[in-house]
Amino acid sequence: PLPVVVVAYPITYDGHPDSYPLHIASKILSDGQSSRIYRKLVYDTGLALTAFGGGNIVEHPNLFYAVAIVQPGHTTEEVAQALIGEFERFRNEPVSDRELQQSKNQFARDYITSRETNQQKASHLAHAVVIHQDVRTADGEFDIFTGMTPADVQRVARTYFTPDTRLVMTILPKAGANRSVR
């Protein structure tokens, strides 16, 4: 086992106006190997074996988090500072038009593929009624997401990714955990 670093920030609930740009932020920061966090920590610096995260946007306020498994030869402090640095960069620099368009394309793909069966369609309708109290959001969210701007995304980053609310957690392997199992 290797050390793990988690950086997290409290965020709002699903259906809040800020939840939509937070979804976009999640795509840009932590959705896959082309995300900012993965590229920076795995490809560019080699600080982490892998890195991932996302916004846990549900019916109650929750967390936006990033997780990185520390590459041997590096410290948890280096990894924590790199993760924090990416959140700070996200707060201070607007996302590029290319990043925003890529995240919208990912959203459109997810939107379509998550509505292929009748059960999936019913689930989206139920979510709209129960969580949003408005059945129109089942389809109306598509227009909200495609209308996002870099300023919308940066505004929520500045609102939620603040040093005062940041949680940094380091998980260390138990002593002797690196021994081979026989």
Task: Go through the PLM ranges and name each one.
Residues P1-S34:
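His/Glu-based metal-binding/catalytic segments typifying zinc-dependent metallopeptidases
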Residues P1-Y13, R39-G147, R166-P173, R179-R182:
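M16 family metallopeptidases and their MPP-like homologs
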Residues I24, F52-G53, E141, R155-A157:
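Short beta-alpha junctions and helix-cap segments that line functional grooves
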Residues A25-S26, Y38, I84, Q154, ...:
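Generic solvent-exposed, charged/amphipathic alpha-helical segments
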Residues T149-D152:
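Charged alpha-helix within mobile-element recombinases
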Residues Q154-I171:
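Bilobed periplasmic-binding protein-like "clamshell/Venus-flytrap" ligand-binding domains
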